Amino acid sequence: MAKRDYYEVLGVERGASEAELKKAYRRLAMKYHPDRNPDDKGAEEKFKEANEAYEVLSDAGKRSAYDQYGHAGVDPQMGGGGGAGFGGANFSDIFGDVFSDFFGGGRGGSRGGAQRGSDLRYTLELDLEEAVRGTTVTIRVPTLVGCKTCDGTGAKKGTSPVTCTTCGGIGQVRMQQGFFSVQQTCPRCHGSGKMITDPCGSCHGQGRVEESKTLSVKVPPGVDTGDRIRLSGEGEAGTHGGPAGDLYVVVNVREHAIFQRDGKHLYCEVPISFADAALGGELEVPTLDGRVKLKIPEGTQTGKLFRLRGKGVAPVRGGAAGDLMCRVAVETPVNLNKRQRELLDEFRKSLQGDDSHSPKASGWFEGVKRFFGDV
């Protein structure tokens, strides 16, 4: 019976990448593996066919020969350079994943079974003032801690874990599948080499219990949204004697009523009357350190930025403090009384025919005239 095209066997295009080949092969290996299809000759043949296809296509040299000459290029009986082994393919890596799926375990278990606890994340809400000046806060974090009843062993007090009978205490088992052998984490003890025959009643044999920890967090001055503070060893407790993970406190700075922050600089809007904008003046503006005087020159327009150097934020990693940028907003008066309206009307009449008082408006109107061909 003629062999099927190897690309067709794996269900990939001829230009498939190494990752695509591996993904396709792993899917077929999972589907047709003999352990999942006992006494199914058809599945066994498809499993062997997928093995053969992947063994050739995962090796650059064999794949090149196959692409050029077809099966004849890799079949030694037909003069090709291929062999019967699995030289180019890393089946151990792939089947480590496959077997872990069969048994529900992971490939990360090391000999002895000690595993580091998971890292935790906690979002810390801060006011702008707290973020700029630094602070110390107390937080409560739900986590997994070592069981005090059994000292983290998982075994009932007065008893001890026994040697795993499946792996003989080494935490690994060797599995033979056809042409190859794979060493895998023991599915019974999950790599610890030990079995708990009489589990602790407090943690039910897990060696860890849920608990909320109260921690004090020192927040350095200058932090900003997204900055992380690492508390080493304050994550979840490890298993089988493994170290605890870390806690990452992630800063989120709340919006401020007056200031907007951009890195080390602060921005604020300063409303002024149109009289102060025209005649100039002096007013007080807020900073994080208190009020300061800001001189407004005559003829100030809306949007004008005034820089107060050093009144921003000192960066958390050191360096000069940023600046406070005050953006002027000229306000139009409302709710005028009769006398005020008369004065403004008189003022408006005094401006007629003299464009020098409003250079931007004059330029704008001239542009409009040119646009419509009025000049």
From Swiss-Prot:
The compartments listed are: Cytoplasm
InterPro entries (alphabetical): DnaJ, DnaJ_C, DnaJ_domain, DnaJ_domain_CS, HSP40/DnaJ_pept-bd, HSP_DnaJ_Cys-rich_dom, HSP_DnaJ_Cys-rich_dom_sf, J_dom_sf
Q: Summarize the subunit comment.
A: Homodimer.
**What does UniProt give as GO cellular component?**
cytoplasm
Q: What is the lineage of its organism?
A: Bacteria, Pseudomonadati, Pseudomonadota, Gammaproteobacteria, Pseudomonadales
Q: Which organism is it from?
A: Ectopseudomonas mendocina (strain ymp)
Task: Report the domain remarks.
Answer: The J domain is necessary and sufficient to stimulate DnaK ATPase activity. Zinc center 1 plays an important role in the autonomous, DnaK-independent chaperone activity of DnaJ. Zinc center 2 is essential for interaction with DnaK and for DnaJ activity.
Check the record and name the Pfam families matching this protein: DnaJ, DnaJ_C, DnaJ_CXXCXGXG
Which note does the record give on the cofactor?
Binds 2 Zn(2+) ions per monomer.
Give binding positions for Zn(2+) 2: C164, C167, C186, C189
CXXCXGXG motif repeat segments run 147-154, 164-171, 186-193, 200-207
GO terms (molecular function) for this protein are:
ATP binding; heat shock protein binding; unfolded protein binding; zinc ion binding
Entry binding sites for Zn(2+) 1: C147, C150, C200, C203
Please list the GO biological process terms of this entry: chaperone cofactor-dependent protein refolding; DNA replication; protein refolding; response to heat
In this protein, which residues make up the domain named J? 5-70
Q: What is this protein called?
A: Chaperone protein DnaJ
**UniProt keyword list:** Chaperone, Cytoplasm, DNA replication, Metal-binding, Repeat, Stress response, Zinc, Zinc-finger
| Cofactors required | Zn(2+)
HAMAP family given for it?
A: DnaJ (MF_01152)
Family per UniProt? Belongs to the DnaJ family.
Q: Where are the zinc fingers (CR-type)?
A: 134-212
